[in-house]
Amino acid sequence: MILVRTLLLWLVATCVHAAPPAFAPVTPGRTLAFPADYGAHPDYRTEWWYATGWLKTPDGKPLGFQVTFFRSRTETDPANPSAFAPKQLIIGHAALSDPVLGHLVHDQRSARAGFGLAYAGTGTTDVKLDDWSMRREPDGRYRVVVRAGELSFTLRLAPTQPVLLQGEAGFSQKGPQAGHASYYYSEPHLQVDGDVVHAGRKQAVTGTAWLDHEWSSQVLDTNAAGWDWTGVNLDDGGALMAFRIRARDGSTLWAHATWRDGAGKVTQYGPDQVRFAPQRTWTSPRTNAAYPVATLLTTGTTQWRIEPLQPDQELDSRRSTGAVYWEGAVTVQRDGRPAGRGYLELTGYVSAMKL
């Protein structure tokens, strides 16, 4: 008991005298450099690697998948010499969308970085969380491994196109204030192969994926509730990314879109050129949140109709990030014709999102 009290007093004293860290700022004009920027940026507050995609089983059945690794720098004094000091946290989310089930199968994990069990490496993508991992191989392919209770998968994601820099050469504004921004790039049209274990059955899968990598120290305005985001692999070889940051009253604080057409031409759309118009909502029986799962997205003069693979794609991550959000596979039409497939993310509909 004396030892416990001594340890508690030491921890309190450490916290009282600890110097808060200075998080690295996100500023325009920085040139993203690869392969280094594939890796972690531990001086920034928040970072994530996010892969989503559509898979097909041998019998032609569609599945959606999502795996995200978060790295979060805490406010622990960086000069703290203890190997147990939680200076960096690693969090993982994984989900499988199966229309036969009618809802997501998902899991989550979190741990402090250290001891080789959880880390986000610099220099290239190399993230590990127990037996979950995402690693970029020397040939550019990603290997993603998830082992969980109700789902497991081992996937290989092979790039087929150049990196797509979002915003201003990778500087992505997220609000009216200069500091609300991130560094952000995407890798659309990743060819996928591997296997999925679900409902006690192992199946080979192929498909197409989208990978985002984003890092920041201050993303959201204090009046922000959350965001609507979509990333779409277009059938003509193009790629579309769009988002809006929502205020607490439901209005749009900021919006942006990037469209790379099939010939490789990139067009950026500012806040006044991007509009999300909900067409249909789905109300969760678990949280009572109403999500706009079908949306009409306008970028410039082009309209894209977004429809979900299934309505219930809500993910409860309160055990790791404290948030509940909707993250689901979607199809996209342009001018009434099929145009592509991707993912839609809807956050802040249960409670205001905090990063």
Where are these regions (language model features)?
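Sec-dependent signal peptide recognition
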Residues: I2-L9
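N-terminal signal peptide c-region/cleavage motif recognized by signal peptidases
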Residues: A13-C15
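Structured soluble/peripheral alpha/beta segments that form catalytic or ligand/cofactor-binding pockets
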Residues: A19-L355
